[in-house]
Amino acid sequence: MTRRLILLRHGQTHYNASFRMQGQLDTELSELGVRQAHAVGRVLAPRRPWTILSSDLRRARDTATALAAEVGLEVHTDPRLRETHLGSWQGMSHSEVDEKWPDARQQWRSRPRWSPPEGESRIDVAQRTRAVVDELVEQSPEWNEHPAVLVAHGGAIAALTAALLELRVEQYPMFNGLGNACWVQLSAHPRAQGSPGGAPEPEVPPVTDTARGLLWRLDQWNVGITPPVGEQ
């Protein structure tokens, strides 16, 4: 049985538009972001998701609610799907961070164990978000090719994708640049029995027995509406 998972990033916020570091600040969708949320809801509805989980931050929750209205589902929230906590950077513009901490943003993007002052690393985020998916696998034997949709944030989705694919830590930075109201699709397949031993333990291993028996594959990355909302 194949399980499909869609990871959807929230619509645009004013912080996105002005290149400010949001992290776990509870920002709202911009007018464009609201339009993106409704548009992506209409696009994903024909895939008939069976459940919708969302970060409890407003920008993700409102995006999830737009999809839920199209398919007649409730939105279940989980704070573990929040964006990376950016510590002292939260609320600052990119240029303000670069002025106060030269080269720090590059360190943050290229070193998954590195964290901003008083913030989280990408590995921290991968651990808490992976647990959400593994628990969903464990609790949902009915999960089939109709997708579960998780609505979250760019950094959180990048970290979760790398964790589900069991990448080495130095490979985590390959996932970045997920657009607003764009999504990732992965599929989980039974892991082959009797595979050769000696493989290294994943940086962020599965946390439930059922999840340990699955191998996730990347089907789509950074897929969005065509043409983008605002250009239609």
Identify the function of each model-found stretch.
Residues 5, 143-152:
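Generic beta-sheet signal
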Residues 1-6, 51:
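Extreme N-terminal starter segment of soluble prokaryotic enzymes
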Residues 45-48, 136-147:
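Glycine-rich phosphate-binding loop signature in dinucleotide/nucleotide-binding domains
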Residues 39-105:
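Phosphate-coordination/substrate-recognition cap region in phosphate-metabolizing enzymes
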Residues 6, 76-78, 219:
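General small-molecule cofactor/ligand-binding pocket signal
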Residues 12-67, 113-132:
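Loop-to-helix element that buttresses phosphate recognition and phosphoryl-transfer chemistry
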Residues 1-3, 69, 84-96, 138, ...:
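Acidic, low-complexity terminal tails and accessory targeting/binding regions
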Residues 11, 154:
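Active-site metal-binding loops of divalent metal-dependent hydrolases
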